[in-house]
Amino acid sequence: MMTGATLCSGIGAPEQAMPWVEWQWCAETEKFPSAVLAARFDHPNLGDITAPDFIDRALSLKPPDLLIAGTPCQSFSIAGLRRSLADDRGNITLRFVEIVNAINPPVVLWENVPGVLNTKDNAFGCFLAGIVGASAPLVPARGRRWSHAGMVDGPKARAAWRILDAQYFGL
């Protein structure tokens, strides 16, 4: 059976959507979503992923085959100030990369808004570089913007992405 864990877990949408996965743990800080997670699922909530000891606590548990995160989108959204990685919330994305590299799960799924593809500081290129093990931020193949779908290879991993619109999936 595939095992999984979630970061920035919210109310547990991945856990609900994929009941065949053996969920090992989650990480959520907000009070209401944490209460929902506790009521619906029996796996531990490791809390704040920015805590200095988070990686050690995660490594002390069974490693997941699948790691899913929906890091905060406000710093990347076109509806916001677009501070990107200059915003603490945007930097949680880079913390996610640190966690991925420490845990090294076979499969990683990251959810965010399309605005992350075209920030002034190339946040998506920084994210991809961290995931695939590149030594510098990656840059889009054509033009100044990342495409809505693509794949990159790096020294440590391969990453693919695609923009999907939830309205077309009955959500």
Predicted regions and their residues:
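Short glycine-/small-residue-rich Rossmann-like dinucleotide-binding loops
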Residues: 72
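SAM cofactor-binding core of SAM-dependent methyltransferases
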Residues: 2-53
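Class I S-adenosyl-L-methionine
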Residues: 55-64, 76-171
